[in-house]
UniProtKB/Swiss-Prot annotation:
Main subcellular location of this protein, as a coarse class: cytoplasm
Protein name as catalogued: Adenylate kinase
HAMAP family linked: Adenylate_kinase_Adk
NCBIfam families linked: PRK00279.1-3, PRK14527.1, PRK14531.1
Catalytic activity: AMP + ATP = 2 ADP
Domain notes: Consists of three domains, a large central CORE domain and two small peripheral domains, NMPbind and LID, which undergo movements during catalysis. The LID domain closes over the site of phosphoryl transfer upon ATP binding. Assembling and dissambling the active center during each catalytic cycle provides an effective means to prevent ATP hydrolysis.
GO process terms (BP): AMP salvage
GO molecular function, one term: adenylate kinase activity
């Protein structure tokens, strides 16, 4: 069974949902970078103070800082882990791969949750968030495509990627993922 897994997919594809379901059923660590950053801030750690300061200035948290927080969580005792929504670009993927090899926890599998754009837009509009207008959603999806397509190719070249049809019900998707993890 694969134990070091990454989930990729557009906003609203169901990465977080599937990552959480799979991590719970296997007692794996589920690492979502957004949650990790919030947790560091909440716990008022040295890294959290740095992150809070950067965010308060309206700046993006650097790749180096995010990677440091991810690494710190990966080296903790775990039966396995699932990364959700990170890396987001080639530079982050290369850095992450270096760290994973250093800590002897190489990436074993990448699930790409594939979903038609129109289905994705409908899903995101149904979430009912104030900032989720069709225009802003399409912009986010376009940005995602531009940055993620090279990432998908990168993992494809490493023979790590598995495509998952994310336009199905939750149980069917989870079952498909579990089969591919075996």
């Amino acid at each position: 069974m694969k134990k070091h897994i990454l989930f990729l997919g557009a906003p609203g594809a169901g990465k977080g949902t599937q990552a959480e379901l799979i991590s719970q059923s296997n007692s794996y660590l589920h690492l979502s970078t957004g949650e990790l950053l919030r947790k560091e801030i909440e716990m008022n750690t040295a890294l959290g103070i740095q992150v809070k300061d950067i965010m308060n200035r309206g700046e993006l948290v650097s790749d180096e800082l995010v990677l440091k927080i991810v690494r710190q969580n990966l080296v903790k005792d775990n039966k396995g882990w699932i990364l959700d929504g990170y890396p987001r670009n080639l530079s982050q993927a290369n850095s992450l791969n270096e760290v994973l090899n250093e800590i002897n926890q190489p990436l074993e599998l990448v699930f790409y949750l594939d979903i038609p754009e129109e289905v994705l837009i409908k899903r995101l509009l149904l979430r009912g968030r104030k900032d989720d207008t069709e225009e802003t959603i399409r912009t986010r999806v376009d940005i995602y495509k531009k940055t993620t397509e090279p990432l998908i190719q990168y993992f494809k070249d490493l023979s790590l990627i598995e495509y998952i049809d994310a336009d199905r019900d939750l149980k069917t998707i989870s079952s498909d993922i579990k089969q591919k993890m075996a």
